Regions:
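The beta1-alpha1 cofactor-binding region of Rossmann-like NAD(H)/NADP(H)-dependent oxidoreductases
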Residues: 39, 60-72, 103, 211
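Short, small/polar-rich loop/turn modules that mediate ligand/substrate recognition or access, typified
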Residues: 175, 180, 228-230
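Alpha-helical segment proximal to the catalytic Tyr-Lys
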Residues: 126, 172-173, 226
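Active-site helix of classical SDR
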Residues: 121, 159, 167
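C-terminal substrate-recognition "lid" of short-chain dehydrogenase/reductases
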Residues: 80, 209-240
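Conserved glycine-rich cofactor-binding loop
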Residues: 13-14
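Substrate-binding pocket helix/loop in short-chain dehydrogenase/reductase
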Residues: 97-98, 102-110, 198
Length: 241
Protein backbone atom coordinates (compact mmCIF):
# COMPACT_ATOMS: atom_id res chain seq x y z
CA UNK A 1 0.00 0.00 0.00
CA UNK A 2 1.06 3.59 -0.48
CA UNK A 3 3.56 4.94 2.00
CA UNK A 4 2.17 8.45 1.61
CA UNK A 5 -1.59 8.92 1.33
CA UNK A 6 -1.94 12.63 0.68
CA UNK A 7 -4.22 13.98 -2.05
CA UNK A 8 -5.06 17.31 -3.62
CA UNK A 9 -8.31 17.44 -5.58
CA UNK A 10 -9.09 20.59 -7.54
CA UNK A 11 -12.65 21.80 -7.82
CA UNK A 12 -13.58 19.61 -4.89
CA UNK A 13 -16.23 21.67 -3.10
CA UNK A 14 -19.15 20.20 -5.03
CA UNK A 15 -20.15 17.59 -7.59
CA UNK A 16 -17.67 15.09 -8.96
CA UNK A 17 -14.75 16.66 -7.12
CA UNK A 18 -16.56 16.42 -3.81
CA UNK A 19 -17.42 12.77 -4.44
CA UNK A 20 -13.79 11.94 -5.29
CA UNK A 21 -12.57 13.76 -2.19
CA UNK A 22 -14.89 11.88 0.15
CA UNK A 23 -14.09 8.56 -1.49
CA UNK A 24 -10.35 9.07 -1.00
CA UNK A 25 -10.93 10.21 2.58
CA UNK A 26 -12.92 7.03 3.22
CA UNK A 27 -9.91 5.05 1.96
CA UNK A 28 -7.55 6.64 4.45
CA UNK A 29 -6.22 9.58 2.44
CA UNK A 30 -5.66 13.01 3.91
CA UNK A 31 -7.18 15.54 1.53
CA UNK A 32 -6.70 19.15 0.50
CA UNK A 33 -10.03 20.52 -0.71
CA UNK A 34 -9.74 23.22 -3.35
CA UNK A 35 -12.35 25.78 -4.30
CA UNK A 36 -12.41 29.07 -6.17
CA UNK A 37 -15.62 30.71 -4.92
CA UNK A 38 -17.76 28.02 -3.23
CA UNK A 39 -16.31 28.44 0.26
CA UNK A 40 -19.46 27.33 2.08
CA UNK A 41 -19.68 24.13 0.05
CA UNK A 42 -15.96 23.46 0.50
CA UNK A 43 -16.36 23.70 4.27
CA UNK A 44 -19.23 21.17 4.10
CA UNK A 45 -17.06 18.79 2.10
CA UNK A 46 -14.27 19.23 4.62
CA UNK A 47 -16.57 18.38 7.52
CA UNK A 48 -17.69 15.21 5.75
CA UNK A 49 -14.09 14.20 5.06
CA UNK A 50 -13.13 14.69 8.68
CA UNK A 51 -15.79 12.16 9.71
CA UNK A 52 -13.66 9.45 8.09
CA UNK A 53 -10.78 10.31 10.38
CA UNK A 54 -8.87 11.97 7.59
CA UNK A 55 -6.91 15.16 7.88
CA UNK A 56 -8.73 17.67 5.71
CA UNK A 57 -8.65 21.39 5.04
CA UNK A 58 -9.81 23.85 2.41
CA UNK A 59 -7.72 26.04 0.11
CA UNK A 60 -8.92 28.85 -2.13
CA UNK A 61 -7.26 29.55 -5.48
CA UNK A 62 -7.97 30.53 -9.05
CA UNK A 63 -5.99 27.80 -10.79
CA UNK A 64 -6.33 29.49 -14.17
CA UNK A 65 -3.59 31.74 -12.78
CA UNK A 66 -0.24 29.87 -12.79
CA UNK A 67 1.03 31.70 -9.72
CA UNK A 68 -2.08 30.86 -7.72
CA UNK A 69 -1.95 27.26 -8.91
CA UNK A 70 1.63 26.98 -7.71
CA UNK A 71 0.77 28.49 -4.33
CA UNK A 72 -2.18 26.10 -4.00
CA UNK A 73 0.05 23.08 -4.51
CA UNK A 74 2.69 24.38 -2.10
CA UNK A 75 0.09 25.05 0.60
CA UNK A 76 -1.49 21.64 0.05
CA UNK A 77 1.84 19.84 0.31
CA UNK A 78 2.82 21.81 3.39
CA UNK A 79 -0.51 21.28 5.13
CA UNK A 80 -0.65 17.58 4.29
CA UNK A 81 2.99 16.88 5.01
CA UNK A 82 3.63 15.80 1.44
CA UNK A 83 1.71 14.97 -1.70
CA UNK A 84 1.28 11.72 -3.61
CA UNK A 85 -2.01 12.05 -5.49
CA UNK A 86 -3.33 14.89 -7.63
CA UNK A 87 -6.79 14.85 -9.17
CA UNK A 88 -7.39 17.64 -11.68
CA UNK A 89 -11.15 17.97 -11.69
CA UNK A 90 -11.63 21.71 -12.09
CA UNK A 91 -13.02 23.00 -15.38
CA UNK A 92 -15.85 25.18 -16.62
CA UNK A 93 -18.39 24.07 -19.22
CA UNK A 94 -19.85 26.14 -22.04
CA UNK A 95 -22.67 25.34 -24.42
CA UNK A 96 -22.76 27.87 -27.26
CA UNK A 97 -22.91 27.74 -31.04
CA UNK A 98 -19.30 27.47 -32.22
CA UNK A 99 -19.47 30.46 -34.55
CA UNK A 100 -20.80 32.62 -31.72
CA UNK A 101 -18.19 31.78 -29.08
CA UNK A 102 -16.43 34.95 -27.96
CA UNK A 103 -12.68 35.22 -27.46
CA UNK A 104 -13.28 35.64 -23.74
CA UNK A 105 -15.46 32.51 -23.55
CA UNK A 106 -12.93 30.50 -25.53
CA UNK A 107 -10.10 31.58 -23.25
CA UNK A 108 -12.13 30.82 -20.12
CA UNK A 109 -12.81 27.23 -21.17
CA UNK A 110 -9.23 26.55 -22.26
CA UNK A 111 -7.84 28.19 -19.12
CA UNK A 112 -10.12 26.45 -16.62
CA UNK A 113 -9.71 23.00 -18.16
CA UNK A 114 -6.46 22.48 -20.07
CA UNK A 115 -4.26 25.24 -18.67
CA UNK A 116 -5.33 24.71 -15.06
CA UNK A 117 -4.53 21.00 -15.36
CA UNK A 118 -1.09 21.85 -16.69
CA UNK A 119 -0.35 24.49 -14.03
CA UNK A 120 -1.34 22.29 -11.09
CA UNK A 121 0.40 19.19 -12.41
CA UNK A 122 3.66 20.98 -13.16
CA UNK A 123 3.70 22.44 -9.66
CA UNK A 124 2.88 19.07 -8.08
CA UNK A 125 5.48 16.93 -9.84
CA UNK A 126 8.41 17.83 -7.53
CA UNK A 127 6.32 16.74 -4.54
CA UNK A 128 5.33 13.44 -6.17
CA UNK A 129 8.98 12.79 -6.96
CA UNK A 130 9.87 13.48 -3.34
CA UNK A 131 7.22 10.99 -2.23
CA UNK A 132 8.83 8.42 -4.58
CA UNK A 133 5.46 7.44 -5.98
CA UNK A 134 2.56 9.37 -7.36
CA UNK A 135 -0.74 9.29 -9.14
CA UNK A 136 -2.05 12.00 -11.46
CA UNK A 137 -5.66 11.62 -12.53
CA UNK A 138 -7.10 14.16 -14.93
CA UNK A 139 -10.79 14.45 -15.70
CA UNK A 140 -11.59 14.26 -19.39
CA UNK A 141 -14.82 13.99 -21.37
CA UNK A 142 -16.24 11.04 -23.29
CA UNK A 143 -16.52 12.91 -26.59
CA UNK A 144 -12.89 13.98 -26.37
CA UNK A 145 -11.63 10.41 -26.11
CA UNK A 146 -12.41 9.65 -29.75
CA UNK A 147 -12.19 13.29 -30.86
CA UNK A 148 -15.87 13.37 -31.79
CA UNK A 149 -17.47 16.60 -32.90
CA UNK A 150 -20.27 17.63 -30.56
CA UNK A 151 -22.60 20.45 -31.45
CA UNK A 152 -22.33 23.64 -29.38
CA UNK A 153 -19.50 22.57 -27.03
CA UNK A 154 -16.45 22.97 -29.26
CA UNK A 155 -14.14 24.79 -26.79
CA UNK A 156 -14.89 22.24 -24.07
CA UNK A 157 -14.17 19.23 -26.30
CA UNK A 158 -10.95 20.84 -27.54
CA UNK A 159 -9.80 21.54 -23.98
CA UNK A 160 -10.55 17.99 -22.84
CA UNK A 161 -8.84 16.51 -25.91
CA UNK A 162 -5.79 18.57 -25.02
CA UNK A 163 -5.87 17.14 -21.50
CA UNK A 164 -5.81 13.60 -22.90
CA UNK A 165 -2.81 14.31 -25.16
CA UNK A 166 -1.00 16.11 -22.34
CA UNK A 167 -1.63 13.21 -19.96
CA UNK A 168 -0.36 10.60 -22.41
CA UNK A 169 2.78 12.60 -23.18
CA UNK A 170 3.50 13.20 -19.50
CA UNK A 171 2.86 9.55 -18.61
CA UNK A 172 5.57 8.40 -20.98
CA UNK A 173 8.10 10.75 -19.40
CA UNK A 174 7.49 9.98 -15.71
CA UNK A 175 6.76 6.24 -15.54
CA UNK A 176 10.36 5.43 -14.55
CA UNK A 177 9.89 7.67 -11.50
CA UNK A 178 7.04 5.48 -10.19
CA UNK A 179 4.49 8.14 -11.11
CA UNK A 180 1.52 7.38 -13.33
CA UNK A 181 -0.80 9.74 -15.19
CA UNK A 182 -4.22 8.71 -16.45
CA UNK A 183 -7.57 10.15 -17.49
CA UNK A 184 -11.09 9.37 -16.31
CA UNK A 185 -13.59 10.52 -18.95
CA UNK A 186 -17.20 10.88 -17.82
CA UNK A 187 -20.11 11.20 -20.16
CA UNK A 188 -23.41 12.22 -18.60
CA UNK A 189 -23.26 12.36 -14.81
CA UNK A 190 -26.04 12.55 -12.24
CA UNK A 191 -25.46 16.30 -11.78
CA UNK A 192 -25.07 17.08 -15.50
CA UNK A 193 -26.90 19.97 -17.12
CA UNK A 194 -29.95 19.09 -19.25
CA UNK A 195 -30.17 15.45 -18.17
CA UNK A 196 -33.56 14.92 -19.80
CA UNK A 197 -32.10 15.79 -23.18
CA UNK A 198 -29.11 13.45 -22.94
CA UNK A 199 -30.47 10.34 -21.22
CA UNK A 200 -32.66 9.08 -24.12
CA UNK A 201 -29.57 9.13 -26.37
CA UNK A 202 -27.52 6.90 -24.06
CA UNK A 203 -27.48 3.10 -24.48
CA UNK A 204 -27.61 2.87 -20.67
CA UNK A 205 -30.62 5.23 -20.49
CA UNK A 206 -29.25 6.72 -17.28
CA UNK A 207 -26.43 8.97 -16.09
CA UNK A 208 -23.34 7.80 -14.26
CA UNK A 209 -23.58 7.90 -10.49
CA UNK A 210 -20.86 9.54 -8.43
CA UNK A 211 -19.73 6.17 -6.99
CA UNK A 212 -19.24 4.84 -10.52
CA UNK A 213 -16.90 7.75 -11.22
CA UNK A 214 -15.05 7.58 -7.92
CA UNK A 215 -14.43 3.87 -8.44
CA UNK A 216 -12.81 4.70 -11.78
CA UNK A 217 -10.56 7.25 -10.12
CA UNK A 218 -9.66 4.75 -7.41
CA UNK A 219 -8.76 2.19 -10.08
CA UNK A 220 -5.90 4.47 -11.12
CA UNK A 221 -4.98 5.67 -7.61
CA UNK A 222 -4.74 2.12 -6.27
CA UNK A 223 -1.07 1.18 -5.76
CA UNK A 224 -1.78 -2.08 -7.59
CA UNK A 225 -2.27 0.00 -10.76
CA UNK A 226 1.43 0.90 -10.89
CA UNK A 227 1.86 -0.56 -14.41
CA UNK A 228 -1.10 1.31 -15.90
CA UNK A 229 -0.32 4.77 -17.25
CA UNK A 230 -1.27 7.04 -20.12
CA UNK A 231 -4.71 5.45 -20.31
CA UNK A 232 -8.22 6.85 -20.67
CA UNK A 233 -11.03 5.15 -18.77
CA UNK A 234 -14.39 6.16 -20.17
CA UNK A 235 -17.29 6.07 -17.72
CA UNK A 236 -20.13 6.91 -20.06
CA UNK A 237 -22.69 4.11 -20.24
CA UNK A 238 -21.81 3.42 -23.86
CA UNK A 239 -21.73 7.07 -25.00
CA UNK A 240 -19.36 6.34 -27.91
CA UNK A 241 -20.77 2.98 -29.00
Amino acid sequence: MAKLKKALITGSAVGIGRAITLDLASRGFDVAIHYRSSEEEAVKTCREALKFGAEAFTLQADVTNPQEARKLVEKAAQGLGGLSVVVNNVGNYLETITSQVSVEEWQEIIDSNLNATFYVTQAALPHLRKAKWGRIINLGFASAQNVLARKNITPYVIAKTGIIIYTKSLAKEIIEENITANVVSPGVVENSIDLNNFIPKLPSKRPASFPELTNAVWFFVNPDACYITGQVLEVSGGWNL
